[in-house]
Amino acid sequence: MRLPASLRELGTAHRGAIELAHATLTIALSWAAVHTIFALHCAHDYYRGAKPGGLQFPSGDTHDHADYWDFVYFSFVIGMTAQVSDVGITDKTIRRTATAHGIISFIYNTALLALMINIAASAIAS
């Protein structure tokens, strides 16, 4: 419920620096929360079976199993680019999760871009 309230606050004509900072911080933290939740979800899928797997990290890795930073990297790359980079997906469940994450990220990033353009246009017009 905080994000719609923050977006509504950005749309008002008389907004101060505190309100603008609050709305911007809320949007940034909600963006990060989405990708952190997907990172935890991918970690759960990776370690759910008797033998961990489902993601193939680059061959230069020195550790045997992925840690949370690996999943954060994987998730935030999807969140920023709506695609995977150097991590191979070898499990159907994780592939479906990554597909949903990519679609949600694309929609979210498009909405944020539109919002920022609207804010910039209204600031220039004022």
Could you say what each language-model-derived stretch is?
Residues M1-A39:
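Long, highly hydrophobic alpha-helical transmembrane signal-anchor segments
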Residues A13, A17, G79-V87, A100:
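General secondary-structure edge motif
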Residues W31, T36-R48, L55-F57, F71, ...:
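Broad hydrophobic/π-residue packing in well-ordered secondary structure
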Residues H44-D91:
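Membrane-proximal soluble regions of multi-pass membrane proteins
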Residues D70, F74-V77, I89-A125:
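Pore domain of cation channels
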